């Protein structure tokens, strides 16, 4: 039995294989030579992700920093939202002393505080506050989620910097606290 040869089909197949090979080589060159979005804490870098469980005043839930970011944000966009991250420890004396001021700033920039006419006191973009509660290397100190809750809510019988968390400065906070007891987030942001 004689084999049938179709030279047109053979030429088309060879051409298709060559075009596909060039396409894949081009994709590989692009992948190797293109820089990804730089991640870090420097100017122009994308912030490292914050991960973990977060306490919002009622329950611990999964925290996703991406939900706070605007993907198509541009400089000067008055409608864009900002994200302010505070790394703190519930037993750090400075953190306890500045808790009142931090809460006031959060209420103002998150547009919770209102003017007499009911409009937000802050006229700029919304600034979302997030506290990443870590455990610093303070001798004789161990933190817990109960202590984080008591610090945020200004309640409970937990101790913050050797006194009751309920006695710290300011009112209860209205922003999210992330459990970073293991310091993973803090290390990413150094």
Where would I find each of the regions flagged by the language model?
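Cys/His/Pro-rich metal-binding microdomains
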Residues: 48, 93-96
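A short beta-strand-turn-helix
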Residues: 51-83, 111
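Short pre-active-site segment immediately N-terminal to redox-active cysteine/selenocysteine motifs
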Residues: 80-83, 88-91, 136
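Structural microenvironment flanking redox-active thiols in thiol-disulfide oxidoreductases
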Residues: 96-170, 180-188
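Extracytoplasmic
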Residues: 47, 78-80, 124
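Secretory targeting signatures
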Residues: 1-46
């Amino acid at each position: 039995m004689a084999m049938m040869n179709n030279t047109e089909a053979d030429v088309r197949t060879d051409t298709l294989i060559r075009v596909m090979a060039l396409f894949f080589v081009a994709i590989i060159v692009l992948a190797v030579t293109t820089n990804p979005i730089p991640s870090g804490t420097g100017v122009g870098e994308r912030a490292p992700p914050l991960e973990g469980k977060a306490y919002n005043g009622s329950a611990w839930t999964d925290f996703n920093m991406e939900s706070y970011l605007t993907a198509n944000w541009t400089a000067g966009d008055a409608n864009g939202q900002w994200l302010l991250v505070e790394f703190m420890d519930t037993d750090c004396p400075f953190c306890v002393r500045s808790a009142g001021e931090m809460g006031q700033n959060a209420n103002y920039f998150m547009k919770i505080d209102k003017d007499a006419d009911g409009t937000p006191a802050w006229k700029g973009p919304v600034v979302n506050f997030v506290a990443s509660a870590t455990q610093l290397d303070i001798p004789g100190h161990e933190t817990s989620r109960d202590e984080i809750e008591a610090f945020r809510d200004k309640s409970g019988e937990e101790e913050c910097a050797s006194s009751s968390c309920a006695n710290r400065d300011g009112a209860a906070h209205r922003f999210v606290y992330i459990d970073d007891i293991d310091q993973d987030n803090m290390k990413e942001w150094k």
